[in-house]
Amino acid sequence: MKSPLGPILGTVLAAVLAAGLPAEAAGKSPDARLRTLPVNSIRAVREYFRYRGPSDMPIVSGHRGCREDGCPENSIRAFEHTLCRVPAFFEIDPRMTRDSVVVLMHDPTLDRTTTGHGPVSEHTWAELRELRLKDVHGNVTDERIPTLEEAIRWSAGKTVVNLDVYTPKEVLGPLLERLGFPPHVMLTIHTPEQAEYYYALSRKTMFSIHIKSLEQLEAFEKTPIDWRNVMAYVGPRMLPENRELYERLRAKGVRCMISLAPTYDRRETPEQRREGYLSDRDILPDVIESDYPIELTRALQSLLGEERP
């Protein structure tokens, strides 16, 4: 049966394609192969993430880069592989080594995603440099663990990196300050206290704030943050009972983001995931995060009978 969301998903596809503005619109691309985003100033980043209305075009986020085509999560290879095919920004995970170097690693331990063993915090950076990353199937790749600074420098002029903050603020804050609080670095914020701390350090940093209820929204409204700097993570799906929350966020120009990582991304095959990606939703999200950003884009293209090289 033809999905009643077909016309709406046309908007999704338009967003996925338009999000990666050509070099002429977004500034000269550092790599002509990559589908870059307009990220060279806080003004450009704010405008890119600003919610404008119900016909607004959703944005795609790669969760930890991507898990596709043998790419290990939280790797430069995953970022580049994705941007060579679709425009996206990336949620990444900073963790600190024993000698206070911030690296990209989701888990507190090395075992699942690397050739190492034990807690990240019990190893030095020199030790971690000798390891190799594994893909989602456990296959060892040639990729090494990147530092956060390497990821930030690589993504400059290309895309936004959204840091899920596990690293102590006393370490992450000074690191970002030393780098000049780059406009393409976004911070995932869980509490009003975190928001106030980082906003005091830089008023030109974008936040991805967890706001899943009106009570949480009201708590963040008591902080001095600039709502032009905010995208809201509202949960794994948009819920009809939370319409008032979404309306209040959007009235501030704030986009509402969902993550498919805990839902459809967990399905075993591309066909099963595609079915989930294209299933009906009562309310269309403004930002969609997925472990499989390329699959998601191609599923939407397939629905519309579109082809992309």
What are these regions (language model features)?
Residues 1-6:
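Positively charged n-region of N-terminal signal peptides that target proteins for export
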